[in-house]
Amino acid sequence: MFLADIGNSYFHLFDGKTVIHLSHKEAIAKYHQENIYYICVKHALNEKISSIPTWHNISIKMKLAGAYRTMGVDRKALCLSHREGIFVDAGSAITVDVIEKGKYMGGFILPGLNAYLQAYRSISGVLDVSLNNAVSLHELPLTTKDGISYGIIASIKTLIDKHRQGKTLYITGGDGKVLSSFFEKAVFDEALVFKGMQNALDVQSTNNNKQ
């Protein structure tokens, strides 16, 4: 059995040990005969993949106490991975959500690292730089590249630290490893969303056995 998190850009597949990143087309061609339990935020794909008999949409099973109606199913799954903590998914956008005793307390959304860089590029070609993944946050920058990198990372870190309040910080997503390096005792885990999905399935299985 595989678990899949189908995003807007990529198809993320988990075999219980390893996370595999594929294009939507590649995933359908290669895994259409496999038994897959998935969540999907790319609505344009739903009709096509719902016709694959061995694939099962479990989005409705991502039940998170306190979640608001339009909250993304991938965010719900991430927050179901642990009963307490602050959860960050650093992808195209950066989502930050707080969980206390299994209940959703609220969260916020920031642009992703690439979106920040694109915003700078749109202002001036002089600001078209790559991110310095090792920029120091303990001293003021002396170059344009470091100034932009500092502005991006420090603004994200300041907001997350404000709401952390001693909670364990869990980080996932394509830019998660980079972002986690700027926090003390952050837990980077590429499989957090899948662990939340599995927890939701386990809860349903337990409830079914009680009936």
Predicted regions and their residues:
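Short loop/helix-cap segments at secondary-structure boundaries that form the rim of catalytic
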Residues: 13-16, 29-32, 45-52, 97, ...
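Active-site rim beta-loop-alpha module in soluble metabolic enzymes
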Residues: 113-166
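Glycine/small-residue-rich loop that forms an oxyanion/phosphate-binding "nest" at active or ligand-binding sites
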Residues: 47-82
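N-terminal beta1-alpha1 ligand-phosphate binding loop
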Residues: 2-27, 40-42, 174, 180
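Short glycine-rich phosphate-binding loop at a beta-alpha junction
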Residues: 33-44, 166-175
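Gly/Ser/Thr-rich active-site loops/lids in small-molecule metabolic enzymes
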Residues: 106-125, 190-197
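Gly/Thr-rich phosphate-binding beta-strand-loop-beta motif of the actin/hexokinase/Hsp70
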Residues: 1-17, 82-103, 120
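Glycine-rich phosphate-binding/hydrolytic loop that grips phosphoryl groups
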Residues: 5, 76, 187-211
